């Protein structure tokens, strides 16, 4: 009756308004006011250790700028029907990170099964690997991120650090270790991944969302099919922070937010944001960023630094059928056959420095951890360095002349 008497498109009632003894009745304006991404970006807090992953969302009904801190979220589920503003929201999140964080501070992994939504970001130095468009490779990338998470926790245990913040602070005074970047893993369409390898994807998402927060790894999952076969109980239970755009039914709204309301949204960026720990979602008009603005951001970011990809992230490291050998880069089947263009330079560096570690190689040659670790394995296999001794760098066992003889 309220909608009828006011000739409104739709009415959303909030009873009661949190913190007040009143009931809220939300009426949509006849003409939507655009929310500029540039304005939202200018109102975000200055980048720091705590706010490096603050991303702009939009404005609430009072005109207050709203953002989300991904490292506090710590994972995010985004859902909504086609054309509701989901893709624009993802672009705002990515653009916020590109404009506020250096590539050595935050790394991105993007999965885009549709091949057109995120492909424009190829070449950005923040990318850990080129935008993944193959659902099978995306499933492998998720598994390898779990491996990276476990590696980080092993380093934290060796260095007696509780989380990535404490570890990076320790690296400022201990030059034997290199700082770790945050990793934000963005999946643009979860449904396509669930069709290919539902069990593997669900298991990896569960592992990451349950334990990866302290390791600085965060997951952003988006889907336009908010059904229970895509947003399963496991996914929902481990991703408490959610954003819902306009959906077609109250059932879909309950699937995303555990309550109705999203079916009454207007579309075009109108969203309900339910952060972790909050029972009542916040209604936000999402910021709009055009394709031209995004292209300018991408071009500017690429002009600052070239991308340095780690292609091993999308390689299956489970090994061959007998489980003895691992497939290395360039098609080699074992450490004995594998070689690296930087191998001789790294040997010379080790001779001069007297010790070596994967972290030192990372910092010196600006390569990924997996590649650095394989080179360390190769050096040990050839008797150039000693075995691992806890978290300390490895000792160099032979002199430069001996190394040259062995290479010959």
Where in the sequence are the language-model features?
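A glycine-rich phosphate-binding loop feature that marks nucleotide/adenosyl-phosphate handling sites
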Residues: 162-167, 316-320
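Short, charged/polar, Gly/Pro-enriched secondary-structure boundary elements
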Residues: 30-36, 402-406
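P-loop NTPase catalytic phosphate-binding loop
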Residues: 3-5, 15-26, 34, 39-162, ...
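Short glycine/serine/threonine/alanine-rich loop segments
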Residues: 8, 217, 367
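Terminal-proximal interaction/regulatory segments of ATP-powered molecular machines
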Residues: 308, 315-408
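Generic detector of short, aliphatic-rich beta-strand segments that form the cores of beta-sheets
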Residues: 23-27, 297, 394-396
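Conserved helix/coil segment N-terminal to the catalytic DExD/H
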Residues: 170-177
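Phosphate-sensing "switch" segment of ASCE/P-loop ATPases
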Residues: 275-322
